[in-house]
């Protein structure tokens, strides 16, 4: 659903809206994961976040938390295992090859928090 579009909406606006909507879903998931592991780092590897660097600050700002690049292969499987180990109280290795760390912009994050509230409200209305 594209909410708020009008006759002045350009293809560039739509592309940005799609990027931000995806980032907000990542933020919703990230918020849930950070409740389980408050000190966890949000790490990404591969896929669109690695291949579309312009999307990285959008996701980082939506999350409101640092976003750490990983150069590890199979990083998603590794991350799931680390989360499980942490919940079991097992000491976690910190030896993965890190890429760049992005820091969120607080002003942008506040805007994205309000946008996530609107997105969640829209999802509830559409159920």
Model features per residue range: what roles?
Residues 1-127:
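Glycine/Thr-rich phosphate-binding loops that ligate phosphate moieties of nucleotide
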């Amino acid at each position: 659903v594209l909410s708020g579009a009008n006759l002045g909406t350009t293809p560039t606006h739509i592309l940005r809206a799609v990027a931000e909507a995806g980032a907000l879903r990542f933020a919703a998931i990230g918020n849930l994961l950070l409740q389980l592991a408050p000190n966890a780092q949000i790490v990404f590897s591969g896929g669109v976040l690695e291949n579309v660097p312009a999307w990285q600050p959008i996701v980082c700002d939506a999350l409101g938390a640092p976003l750490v690049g990983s150069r590890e292969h199979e990083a998603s499987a590794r991350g799931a295992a680390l989360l499980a180990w942490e919940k079991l109280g097992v000491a976690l290795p910190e030896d993965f090859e890190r890429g760049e760390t992005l820091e969120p912009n607080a002003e942008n994050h506040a805007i994205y928090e309000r946008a996530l509230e609107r997105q969640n409200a829209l999802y509830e209305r559409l159920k």
